[in-house]
Amino acid sequence: MITRLFAQLVSLSIVTYWNDAIVATNFSWLFITFFVMTFTFRTFSRYFKKPIIWTLYFFLCLIAFLLLWAARIHINILFSFAFGDVYSFFMAGVFLFYGFGELLPIGSDSDVGEASWVVNPATGASGSGGNGWTESAANDPAREVSLAPFPPQLTHPVPFPAEPGSPDPVSPPPPIASFYSRIERAESLHAGNIELAEDLQRIQEMERNLENERSPYRGRELAARIDWEVRELEGKVARNRAWDMVRDAQLDIWRQGLDQELVRQQENESRLEERRFQSHSTNSLFEADSSRDN
């Protein structure tokens, strides 16, 4: 805020010494059209993920800026003849207190971090426009979720292998033996699926709030929050997929062990049956020899 006010005062002192109305008007249109291009690019560029689309959109905004700058002479001539110096200083004032101030940063990171927004999980009520978001109190740190700076999880790679062809960096997977104690029962698996469904529903609700958000600053904060929630959900899905793989591997081991145990039992039964047959044959021969002796 201090830098913005300082820039406005400096610009006002410069415009004060402008005596030519056309020069002042031209410079005002230059900065106003540049502000329109910058504001449009800054508002809609977050929807483009690929660099080539981002670059093409930048040049599109630049062409629109040049067209506005080329058309300013006709507007200047019309309004300068009608209003004279009043129009000139009016355009300069618009540039001073709106255009050039908006081109500067909004302040330090601490200024951005002061605005914290949390969703009410119980009611979903809102104190600002009914969009499901409420401004949290400073004395309630348990429910306060600051959207800037980002949580430290954003700087860490996904701790499990990603899908084939994924550009996300991943860390080496943990040893498979560490997951043997994490094999859940059917109830815990169902609870995990419910948790993933709730997270997905919360992300969809935040996306609807983002579509209805009119403030560009809160929109950017909400978009950053959505990105973080999506990364968290992807991490949970990756962990569940890894646990499923480990569970399947353990079931295969148990199935192989069961098959081997069944084979051993069949071999033992075969040996026992063979011994019984040999014993029965020996007893029959002994009884036959005894009957001959008698």
Curated annotation (Swiss-Prot):
The chain crosses the membrane at residues 21-41, 51-71, 77-97. Residues 184-215 form a coiled coil. Keywords: Coiled coil, Membrane, Mitochondrion, Transmembrane, Transmembrane helix. InterPro entries: Mt_uS3-like. Residues 265-277 have a biased composition (Basic and acidic residues). It is found in: Mitochondrion membrane. The keyword Iron-sulfur does not apply. A stretch of 270 kb of the mitochondrial genome is duplicated within the centromere of chromosome 2 resulting in the duplication of the gene. The expression of this duplicated gene (At2g07698) is not demonstrated. This is Uncharacterized mitochondrial protein AtMg01200.
